[in-house]
């Protein structure tokens, strides 16, 4: 399935990215990314992921499953939008290294009280352009390629 991107650009004058995020806050299902260039300078975009309950379920080969998901859920690139316009967002725990480093695979898998990898499918985001003081409201939908 190819993801189709729909967006609207509106003025963000008088708003801060943090204010926008706090209006949509969901502790477990939203996020706020600030971009920084060179470790010091604020970059162009702040990205706010709107709450979602859509998560990717992973089995015994999570890295292969993530690759397959990414391959089957390509997003069109639109000039003028940031490179990230939605997709997988989440975390890989420290223990995920066992899936990458062969010599660590023999170690006993620890019992975790949390997911080793947790990824949500972020289809609705707000991007704040820090230079232009404008907002991109972005929604991804899927079109069936069959």
Feature locations, PLM:
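Signature of the chorismate-utilizing enzyme
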Residues: 1-146
